[in-house]
Amino acid sequence: MIIKRTYLLAAAMAIMVAISCKKEVSTPDPVQTNTVDTPEVVKDTLPKLPKPIKVYSNDTVSVKAYDYAGLEYFLKQKNDTTYVVNFWATWCVPCVAELPNFEKINANYKKNKIKVILVSLDMAKMIDTKLLPFIKEKQLKSEVLLLRDPDADSWIPKVDSTWSGAIPATVIYNAEMRKFYEKSFTYDELEKEISNFK
Amino acid sequence: MKKIQFLALFLVMGALAAFTNPLAGGYKVGDTATDFSLKNVDGKMVSLKDIKNAKGYIVVFTCNHCPYAQAYEDRIVALNNKYKALGYPVVAINPNNPEKEKADSFANMQQRAKDKKFSFPYLLDDGQKIFPQYGATKTPHVYVLQKTTKGNVVKYIGAIDDNYEDAKAVKQKYVENAVDALLNNKDVTVKETKAIGCSIKA
């Protein structure tokens, strides 16, 4: 069931309209008020979920692949959830090492509206042989997306102007805040960073 | 008293700058790059100044284990084959600490150089002292240097080209374009690019 809710959030200095489009029913936000005066605007500005350029599947696992234009949606969602977007690959040793910390955050903070998205940068030839078996073997519960856009110079600066291109790299954002990290995370470090996003 | 307050303020600001900008030590285009003396896979020490007939250098931080570096190995060999004779030889440096990444040990470097028929020096950044001066953060990471009277000037930093996956689908050969421009006494148009790579294991 898809429930669309429009929240009007009034801040001391500015009024901000945030749109939430969720697949799950969530507990109502105490500060929300239903807006009746701006539905047309909302409809026009609500970004649509992009179509993947390809879906890679085996018997048990399926991963949606996007080019950067598609992936951008997942880096700019404005709702009441805080997103932890981790750029990784199965061949990246420090990425694989920190992955359980992101999985644990995703599991432990689900009720707190924190969602982990794992953006794989595995190469084409590795998707069937490495990525899909890895997701199955590790039983990854966080959402895994695949970024298939080899012209990296065109999109790395759009993710963050300070990103050199080394992975692991992580973006944490919500409707109000955004931070970029070109580093590995322990669970405690990740938890501490997320606690700043309220 | 005021002086002390000012001093304290400066110290705090200095400390903040040092902590908030850890990558500031790297070279920017236009900077003069340091020379080095690093051990090649043939056991001999190599410095840029020892390379004869060089007009400049294509310094590539690369390694054995990284799939992105592997994807570019043949293209790095091709760069050297094309540009060494023109005065821009490739000098490859493995910046990784072999204790952190066993695949990048000196013995494995020797094997890799042999297997892939590297026609250029493949040096170990022993002690991981050179890559931080250049500001390399990942493999592969290229610095095109031009030899001038005031030293080796950084003319290009970044990726080899715009498609790591498929050499045939490349549209922009960044390094070739930069070296071609230098050989023709022209300005390098694309001076800096970003690419995905494996973080350096220091």
Mark where each language-model region is:
Chain A
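Loop/turn elements at helix/coil->beta-strand transitions in domains of secreted/extracellular proteins
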Residues: K78-Y83, N112-K115, L140-E143, A175
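Conserved redox-active cysteine motifs that mediate thiol-disulfide chemistry
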Residues: F87-K104
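Structural microenvironment flanking redox-active thiols in thiol-disulfide oxidoreductases
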Residues: L99-K138, D151-P157
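A short beta-strand-turn-helix
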Residues: D59-T82, N108
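N-terminal targeting signals for export/organelle localization
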Residues: M1-A65
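Short pre-active-site segment immediately N-terminal to redox-active cysteine/selenocysteine motifs
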Residues: T81-Y83, W88-W91, M123
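Short, internal strand/loop/helix patches
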Residues: L132-I167, A175
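Thiol-/selenol-based redox modules, centered on thioredoxin-like
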Residues: A166-K198
